[in-house]
Design a protein with these regions (language model features):
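Short, small-residue-biased leader/transition segments that mark boundaries at the very start
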Residues: 1-3
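Loop/turn-to-beta-strand initiation segments
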Residues: 6-9, 25-27, 50-55, 65, ...
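Hydrophobic residues in beta-strands of the RecA-like P-loop NTPase core, especially within AAA+ ATPase
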Residues: 12, 30-31, 180, 198
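SF2 helicase catalytic motif II
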Residues: 15-56
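Catalytic P-loop NTPase motifs of RecA-like helicase/translocase cores
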Residues: 17-19, 37-38, 63-64, 126, ...
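N-terminal cationic and glycine-rich segments that engage phosphates or anionic surfaces
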Residues: 28, 42-45, 56, 65-69, ...
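Conserved interdomain linker/interface between the two RecA-like ATPase lobes of SF2 helicase motors
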Residues: 73-135
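C-terminal helicase module of SF1/SF2 nucleic-acid helicases/translocases
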Residues: 99-115, 135, 139-293
Length: 293
């Protein structure tokens, strides 16, 4: 399929860089939520034209993207201000023992006419991982909030039309509590949703946690984000959650992710991990690298 010269702007998903798609004269590519694409996918779309200008946008760049941007040949622009009338999000890492307080907060938000996200890392119970799953939490929420709120369930195993129906019902406030996996991480805009509860939060990375938190930063109401872990989280997991709790600066979170996970490969496909420098360290010598760049 050839995109003719009569078409000036094409908006789409991964389909835009499939093998059989050709462009008459591709000049600029804008990749929103760029961290969601793989290394090969980014190369594919850029190779659809000659000397293509490439603008990549992300609330939290993954380690490799940030490293190439900061220490490579990419110019960086940072937008640090929120849209007009947006309130700062209140983020809290909550011990499992204090879960009742979070549930009381949810009841209060429901009483005020607002909606809630509840996110889990798994769809169903796992024999390997002892963490929250959407199916069980959905049943628990239906029972706990019976007569108070309508609870919905959405995850990646549902058919596209089923997911669309559920999201439309949530958008119309026919569903007040939406239990979900990370499928709601991007592309969801429900202004009336003001609280997100992330269960098994230690199973999510920094970028995903920040993106999930962004689901409730859509209106002029005060948004809330709660992280609750499974039993016995590691010290590294707690440190990661407290870092997200402490700041809403996506670039600062990306830098934290870069220093702790490593940048991956500049000329390979690994998007995190050690670069195996012989003498330098991206974590310890970042100031020197900035001067050299």
């Amino acid at each position: 399929m050839c995109i003719r010269d009569s078409i000036n702007i094409v908006v789409g998903t991964h389909a835009l860089f499939q093998k059989d798609v050709e462009y008459y004269n591709l000049g600029t590519v804008i990749a929103d939520e760029e961290h969601r694409f793989g290394v090969r996918q980014r190369v594919l779309i850029k190779n659809k034209g000659l000397d293509v200008n490439y603008l990549k946008m992300s609330a939290t760049p993954i380690p490799r993207t940030l490293a190439i941007s900061a220490y490579g040949d990419t110019d960086i622009s940072i937008i640090k201000t929120m849209p007009k009338n947006r309130k700062a999000v209140i983020t809290k890492y909550v011990d499992k023992e204090h879960k009742r307080e979070v549930m009381d907060h949810i009841k209060k938000e429901l009483k005020n006419g607002h909606q809630i996200y509840v996110v889990t890392p798994l769809i169903e119970e796992s024999e390997v991982l002892d963490t929250a799953n959407a199916t069980k939490i959905y049943e628990n929420m239906k029972q706990y909030f019976a007569g108070i709120a309508t609870v919905g369930l959405i995850h990646g195993k549902l058919k596209p039309d089923e997911k669309e129906k559920i999201m439309q019902e949530f958008l119309n406030n026919e569903i007040q509590i939406l239990v979900a996996t990370s499928v709601i991480e991007v592309g969801v805009n429900v202004v009336n949703a003001t609280t997100i509860l992330v269960l098994g939060a230690e199973r999510f990375g920094v970028a995903t946690l920040h993106q999930l938190r962004g689901r409730v930063m859509r209106s002029d109401s005060v948004p809330y984000c709660f992280f609750i872990t499974s039993d016995n989280p590691t010290e590294n997991s707690i440190e990661r959650l407290k870092m997200v709790e402490k700041t809403t600066d996506g670039f600062a979170l990306a830098e934290y992710d870069l220093k702790h996970r490593g940048p991956g490969e500049f000329f390979g496909e690994k998007q995190s991990g050690s670069m195996n420098f012989k003498y330098a360290s991206l974590k310890d010598d970042s100031d020197l690298l900035e001067i050299a760049n």
